[in-house]
Regions:
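Metal-dependent phosphoesterase/phosphodiesterase active-site architecture
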Residues: 16
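C-terminal motif of bacterial Sec signal peptides marking the signal peptidase cleavage site
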Residues: 19-22
Length: 404
């Protein structure tokens, strides 16, 4: 990595976020998922991922990255989506927004219009969350799971929390927030971007994107206990995000309960420390970019990665102020998500079916088989261990060799 400093932008990056005009679509108008009772074993080249006659029309763009045959070192479709209308999978109109797992045999994927599914190491099973809203965040707890759509409620499974309604057929219950800070928290002026929490913590952090930069805070905390309804409370002093670029956030991640990273519009990067205390601290960092940062992954307490529009990739290795610029990135498309198993095994996904891999020295573009002429936007990636990668996006979910 080559480290260069843009001193002229340091003060600006710490002072406030810059509004950009466009973000990735989250599929709010797409169709709902089918009933939750269907279970099937994935195959490498079946379902919605098989090319249609329309896919075969026209010339092949970047053919070398899109072979017809699935091999062990190539990403391939892994079932889950249904292009035939038989009801055996998610509609290909759905987008996967987030993938998270506890292990190779316990993986969840969530997305547009209530799309939600679980992989048990062998097969995918659709799970009905109840509300058919776009799901933007997914937390795996000890025990239970939480998914988030709108900024006014949570949807939980396996959590003993007060105020739950009747469960869905998938075992999920919806719980509205008890809002303690109505004076400052306006869910109609904010769009929920994502959520983050340590699996055992009662506190869940919410990252929001304000319609106007600096108009309201983009970081809030949700308190979840078995004895009371979920309560949304202030995480930072009022108007903090007028001075620090935290009003238009898009992604969060951390490796320990006490600290995490949040990134967003205008190249914003902030680090929250003492995250479990009543008085957390927030520090702005210099990303050396004004591009929107749309994904972040924390490798360790001393290393993290973030990705964004126009092929932006930044790497943090402990500097007190500045993130390094990744120099040999082989694309300029918008990038949405980053994950890995270590600093030498990092995966990034984005527009035009672009998947990148970093081996500790160089970035390379990965091949995808079985797409025909399709070049779907890829918006989610999660890695359980080296060689076991899940990638999701518009009407597709992929794995190496099409295998778990």
């Amino acid at each position: 990595m080559k480290k260069s400093f843009l001193f002229a932008t340091m003060a600006a990056c710490a002072a406030g976020a810059t509004t950009l005009g466009a973000c990735a679509t989250d599929g709010d108008t797409q169709k709902a998922a089918p009933p939750p009772s269907t279970t099937w074993t994935p195959t490498a080249d079946a379902g919605a991922d098989a090319p249609s006659p329309e896919d075969d029309a026209g010339s092949c763009a970047e053919c070398e990255y899109f072979p017809e045959t699935c091999t062990d070192d190539v990403l391939c479709p892994n079932g889950l989506f249904d292009a035939t209308g038989t009801g055996t999978g998610l509609t290909p109109m759905a987008r996967i927004n987030v993938i998270r797992g506890r292990s190779r045999s316990d993986v969840w994927a969530a997305g547009a219009m209530g799309a939600l599914a679980h992989f048990d190491g062998t097969s995918w099973t659709i799970s009905d969350p109840g509300p058919k809203e776009t799901l933007r965040a997914l937390l795996l707890r000890n025990p239970g799971e939480i998914v988030f759509g709108e900024a006014t409620k949570i949807i939980t499974r396996g959590l003993p929390v007060e105020g739950a309604g009747e469960p869905s057929s998938g075992g999920w219950t919806t719980r509205p927030y008890s809002m303690l800070d109505w004076e400052y928290y306006d869910p109609f002026a904010l769009k929920l971007a994502t959520a983050w929490s340590s699996p055992d913590s009662e506190r869940v952090w919410l990252a929001m994107t304000a319609h106007t930069a600096g108009a309201t805070d983009g970081l809030w905390r949700l308190r979840i206990t078995p004895s009371a309804p979920p309560e949304i409370i202030r995480a930072l002093p009022p108007y903090t995000c007028s001075a620090v670029p935290c009003s238009q956030l898009l992604a969060m991640d951390g490796v320990e309960a006490s600290s995490f990273w949040a990134v967003g519009m205008g190249g914003a990067i902030v680090r929250v420390t003492d995250a479990e205390s009543d008085s957390p601290s927030i520090t702005a960092f210099n990303s050396q970019s004004w591009n929107a940062l749309q994904g972040v992954w924390t490798t360790s307490a001393n290393e993290a990665w973030t990705v964004g529009t126009q092929g932006t990739i930044r790497h943090w290795v402990g500097d007190p102020l500045v993130w390094e610029v990744a120099t040999d990135v082989p694309t300029n498309v918008d990038l949405y998500s980053v994950w890995g198993s270590s600093g030498n095994d990092v995966w990034v996904v984005g527009d035009d079916a672009v998947v990148l891999h970093y081996d500790g020295e160089h970035w390379s573009r990965m091949k995808i088989a079985g797409l025909g002429r399709r070049r779907p936007t890829l918006t989610a990636v999660w890695v359980s261990e080296p060689g076991h990668v899940w990638v999701g996006g518009d009407g597709v979910i992929l794995s190496l060799g099409g295998k778990p």
